[in-house]
């Protein structure tokens, strides 16, 4: 519920989270779930005894945080309904993080460093995951048309360009928001791809249009198309 004595701000506080979830998986899942509302500055989740089952998500805009609080209240996250409110203050979130806050400028430099490293690794490989090739050491844009994109509409979606650490729960949190969702299918031997089944092709089309290009990580916009049948 919205807490009357805490003014709306860009940071939200989440509790009643399943404590068995590993820290990095939890942060990825929260990023995946809440980035639909707007750009995120940070996701903080700690596994210290006092802070288990809690997390903080920081948006760039207060309106995004407000939408998240309203729409995700009691959302079943890893089998437990989330309790969400505005964080007491941004400084409170930083304090709770026990010094883990990274200033925006420093964080941007770190992201640039990671991106340079990723490109360097790609230049040493003849191809990228999911079959995408490289051109002059740079990845091919993920939305280039392929035969998969021209499949006739049906109730099963083919998802690729996923981070290799993506799991079925992370995808379910996204796709079950749309009517007719049935199941997620992933192939262990082929990380980075998944199949999502809906009851009919109208419902699968709605989900595809809504989630096309959704970024599970800043470097991985999802590519969604109809599956071959």
From Swiss-Prot:
InterPro entries: Nucleotide-bd_a/b_plait_sf (IPR012677), RBD_domain_sf (IPR035979), RRM_dom (IPR000504). CDD domains: RRM1_U1A_like (cd12246), RRM2_U1A_like (cd12247). The keyword Protein transport does not apply. It holds the Pfam family RRM_1. It is found in: Nucleus, Cajal body; Nucleus, Nucleoplasm; Cytoplasm. Residues 104-122 have a biased composition (Basic and acidic residues). Residues 10-89, 155-229 form the RRM domain. GO terms for molecular function: RNA binding. One of its GO terms (biological process) is cold acclimation. Residues 104-150 are annotated as: Disordered. One of its GO terms (cellular component) is U2 snRNP. Residues 123-137 have a biased composition (Polar residues). The keyword Glycoprotein does not apply. Keywords: Cytoplasm, mRNA processing, mRNA splicing, Nucleus, Repeat, Ribonucleoprotein, RNA-binding, Spliceosome. Involved in nuclear pre-mRNA splicing. Belongs to the RRM U1 A/B'' family. Component of the spliceosome where it is associated with snRNP U2. This is U2 small nuclear ribonucleoprotein B'' 2.
